[in-house]
């Protein structure tokens, strides 16, 4: 068999083999990559949130609360964010963030493959070994994707250090890049990024750190912000200023290296000093009680989620100047009441020299080199008492100041049953060396006391000019509240619910149901005038009565404040002088009249009458209700007086003027047509709507005017006479309960209705028998009203010409017409009810209606 011969066999080309292998590997790798990507996409892409449309971008943003005159009063948020359009973000700020976070942002497709892979490997190793550091590897697009995931899935799930989370983040980043422009991604990122200091987004950060708008930032300020996203806490300019400065230098260096800024700009920004500020707590600093009541109202109507996330603009009816005046009046008046209670002793007694030295050293560290500033409060230590006991040396930090006896004349032992001026002290003997005190620095001797009754030149001490002086203070124990209403605009202009919101958020204006005392008497007399046809000149009998309650086996014997009796008096005199017995007798007559001699039914009818005026709380089912024994809320008492001011028309009182959503669309609007702070558009729209809300006539205009005139007399010459210092026509009523547990003064001018209350929260003991409404509450009312109405004339309380009212001069004793004389007074009457010449007016003068006491 012959050999096989191969003919024309080509030579092997060995050099092609590597290329074939490479091709095979590339094909296999590509196939694996596609399959792998498909598998990853199938496994992890399910449930990824939709890419947000930029024009429908709705991140959580803060709700802002403003006063009626545009002052920021509070903010509420989960994330403090303000969305700013991309066009308003400075180019340099955009460049700073790109330089710091993602220098190749405009060149990549959304994902840093190497960084993400490295982060995934290290995350896996960390999970297996428990060692190592979890590492990030995110572009700006990936960070934006993470924010979208957090919004859709919640913080915990979307920030978990897992491979799954990183993959989902990368997949979403690719979607973002495919569906949005780079500028749109930056818009989302710069409004979402957390920058510490309660700041989400660059606008919020600009405000929080620098108190500026983002468009006004300097390059140095921009670089500092751009350095924060990686670790806001670590690079905080507050807690780590040196790290923040180094990080800022890094950002500026990156910007220079990338050609974003010149060498000169780099040099200037590197040298620039950047001032940062703490976040202003406007809620607590300005009007916490008012703002908190606003928050509750918004939550009740729209829900907490809307408040915290939807960026409402809430415009309250609060007048910022009136609110400040109210807060100052409450503080000043409450401190005065508390001092009249007496001195409760030092904050602490340091008996040993070692304890005293330790306190002084600590105080030095706190004070540093600060000077003693008049008007400020300090905690000091008594280090020496003068031999004559007329002054004490107080050490504040390392400085010694003088406390003369004049600065603590009020510091007697606590005793509310002794009249204050008679127990003023003339020395500093209540103090001991080692006492830790609250003192207030004063400018000169005149500032040592606000109390004219306590002034004494001899107790001011002889000191060199300019020597630091202080006066003794103490944290007040009683509470106070004030509420002020513009009756015509129906605006709640000012409100203070207590002495210290931080110590107790309980808002006494809305939440404290307190006995109004004699403040309720105008309601009783309004009922008698309205229902029984009584007049200002109706003769009442001020004589002793006893009320027996066989059902409860009680005997009640009301008495006047002065415990005396005046016999026959006119109704106006009875109210002006706040006489108790005529008010009780009027209440009894009214109950018998309305109940057709059935007093139980009659008291229920009076209760209905009071509720019709605006009270929500029930009257006690007995005659003590005449003297204000049934509790009322301060806001409701003020609203009822506002109804009287409006000639008997009841209308709602608003403390929210309007609410707008994040786009400026109106959510609700109660703007008054004559609101000087509102836009013409708001005034016209809301004013037109109010034409169809005329209010409810719950008291005839004639009766309302007569009650106003009665209360005008209280201010002109009765228990509220001190209110004449206002220098403007006012009408109102004092209120004092048994044992002075509550002290009130509620009064109004034509344009402003204000109610002030003073008392203890839990009634541990009374304010003291001399702390009447006229002494404890009226000064707060007056201090507020003098500032609130400064420069504003108030018209007299003249009746409208259309009302059928007439004036007559009446004899004070008989109620008959009188020509002249000191025993007569001019009164208003509804036409047809004025007395005749020859016959005394009849009504409550029949003393036989009541059980007489021998």
Regions found by a protein language model. Name each.
Residues 97-98, 255, 326, 489-490, ...:
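Active-site SXXK
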Residues 125-154, 215, 282-285, 488, ...:
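Conserved catalytic neighborhood of penicillin-recognizing serine enzymes
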Residues 1, 10, 280, 351-365, ...:
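Soluble, non-transmembrane domains of envelope/secretory-pathway proteins that act on or interact
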Residues 273-274, 279, 283, 318-319, ...:
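Active-site-proximal helix/loop microenvironment
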Residues 132, 262-372, 558-563:
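Non-catalytic structural connector segments
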Residues 3-7, 12, 29, 60-62, ...:
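Peptidoglycan glycan-strand catalytic modules in the bacterial/periplasmic cell-wall system
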Residues 287-306, 480-515, 526-527, 644-645, ...:
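Active-site beta-strand/loop architecture of penicillin-binding DD-peptidases
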Residues 1-66, 104, 337:
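N-terminal type II signal-anchor transmembrane helix
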């Amino acid at each position: 068999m012959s050999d096989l011969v191969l003919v024309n066999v080509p030579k092997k080309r060995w050099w092609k083999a590597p290329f074939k292998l490479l091709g095979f590997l590339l094909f296999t790798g590509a196939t694996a990559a596609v399959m792998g990507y498909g598998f990853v996409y199938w496994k992890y892409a399910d449930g990824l949130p939709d890419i947000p449309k930029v024009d429908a971008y709705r991140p959580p943003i803060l709700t802002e609360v403003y006063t009626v005159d545009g002052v920021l009063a509070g903010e509420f948020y989960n994330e403090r964010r303000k969305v700013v359009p991309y066009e308003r973000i400075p180019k340099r700020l955009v460049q700073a963030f790109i330089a710091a976070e993602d220098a190749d942002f405009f060149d990549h497709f959304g994902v840093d493959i190497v960084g993400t892979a490295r982060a995934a490997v290290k995350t896996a190793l960390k999970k297996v070994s428990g060692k190592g550091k979890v590492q990030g590897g995110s572009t700006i697009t990936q960070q934006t994707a993470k924010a979208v995931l957090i919004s859709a899935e919640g913080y915990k799930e979307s920030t978990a250090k897992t491979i799954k989370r990183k993959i989902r983040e990368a997949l979403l980043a690719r979607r973002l890049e495919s569906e949005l422009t780079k500028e749109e991604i930056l818009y989302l990122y710069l409004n979402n990024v957390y920058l510490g200091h309660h700041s989400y987004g660059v606008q919020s950060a600009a405000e929080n750190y620098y108190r500026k708008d983002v468009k006004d930032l300097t390059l140095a300020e921009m670089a500092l912000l751009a350095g924060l996203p990686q670790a806001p806490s670590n690079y905080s300019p507050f807690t780590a200023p040196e790290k923040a400065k180094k990080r800022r230098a890094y950002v500026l260096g990156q910007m220079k290296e990338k050609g974003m800024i010149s060498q000169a700009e780099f040099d200037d920004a590197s040298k620039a000093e950047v001032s940062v500020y703490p976040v202003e707590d406007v809620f607590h600093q300005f009007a916490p009680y008012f703002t908190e009541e606003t928050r509750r109202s918004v939550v009740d109507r729209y829900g907490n989620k809307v408040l915290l996330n939807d960026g409402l603009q809430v415009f309250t009816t609060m007048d910022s100047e009136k609110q400040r005046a109210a807060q100052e009046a409450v503080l000043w008046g409450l401190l005065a009441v508390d001092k009249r209670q007496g001195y409760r002793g030092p904050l602490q007694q340091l008996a040993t020299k070692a304890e005293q030295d330790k306190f002084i050293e600590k105080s030095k560290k706190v004070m540093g080199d600060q000077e003693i500033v008049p008007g400020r409060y300090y905690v000091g230590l008594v280090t020496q008492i003068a031999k004559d006991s007329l002054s004490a040396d107080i050490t504040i930090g390392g400085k010694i100041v003088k406390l003369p006896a004049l600065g603590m004349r009020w510091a007697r032992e606590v005793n509310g049953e002794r009249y204050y001026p008679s127990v003023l002290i003339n020395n500093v003997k209540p103090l001991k060396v080692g006492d830790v005190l609250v003192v207030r620095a004063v400018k000169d001797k005149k500032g040592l006391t606000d109390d004219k009754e306590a002034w004494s030149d001899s107790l001011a001490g002889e000191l060199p000019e300019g020597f630091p002086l202080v006066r003794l203070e103490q944290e007040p124990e009683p509470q106070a509240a004030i509420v002020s209403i513009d009756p015509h605009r129906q605006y709640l202009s000012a409100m203070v619910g207590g002495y210290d919101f931080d110590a107790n958020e309980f808002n006494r204006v809305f939440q404290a149901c307190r006995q109004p005392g004699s403040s309720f008497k105008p309601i009783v007399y309004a009922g008698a005038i309205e229902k029984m046809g009584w007049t200002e000149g109706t003769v009442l009998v001020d004589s002793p009565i006893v009320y027996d309650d066989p059902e409860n086996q009680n005997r009640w014997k009301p008495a006047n404040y002065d415990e005396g009796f005046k016999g026959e008096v006119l109704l106006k005199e009875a109210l002006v002088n706040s006489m108790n017995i005529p008010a009780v007798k009027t209440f009894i007559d009214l109950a018998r009249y309305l109940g057709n001699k059935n007093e139980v039914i009659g008291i229920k009818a009076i209760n209905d009458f009071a509720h019709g005026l605006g009270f929500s709380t029930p009257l006690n089912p007995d005659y003590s209700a005449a003297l204000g024994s049934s509790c009322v809320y301060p806001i409701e008492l003020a609203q009822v007086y506002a109804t009287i001011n409006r000639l008997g028309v009841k209308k709602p009182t608003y403390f929210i003027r309007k609410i707008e959503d994040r786009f400026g669309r109106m959510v609700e609007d109660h703007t008054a047509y004559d609101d000087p702070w509102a836009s013409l558009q708001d005034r016209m729209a809301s004013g037109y709507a109010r034409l169809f809300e005329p209010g409810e006539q719950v008291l005839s205009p004639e009766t309302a005017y007569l009650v106003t005139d009665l209360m005008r007399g209280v201010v002109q010459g009765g228990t509220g006479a001190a209110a004449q210092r206002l220098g403007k026509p006012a009408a109102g009523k004092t209120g004092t309960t048994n044992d002075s547990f509550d002290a009130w003064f509620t009064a109004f001018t034509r344009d402003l209705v204000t109610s002030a209350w003073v008392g203890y929260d839990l009634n541990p003991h009374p304010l003291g028998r001399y702390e009447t409404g006229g002494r404890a509450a009226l000064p707060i009312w007056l201090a507020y009203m003098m500032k609130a109405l400064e420069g504003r004339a108030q018209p007299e309380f003249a009746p409208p010409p259309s009302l059928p009212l007439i004036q007559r001069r009446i004899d004070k004793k008989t109620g008959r017409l009188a020509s002249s004389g000191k025993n007569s007074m001019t009164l208003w009457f509804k036409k047809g009810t004025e007395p005749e010449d020859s016959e005394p007016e009849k009504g409550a003068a029949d003393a036989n209606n009541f059980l007489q006491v021998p």
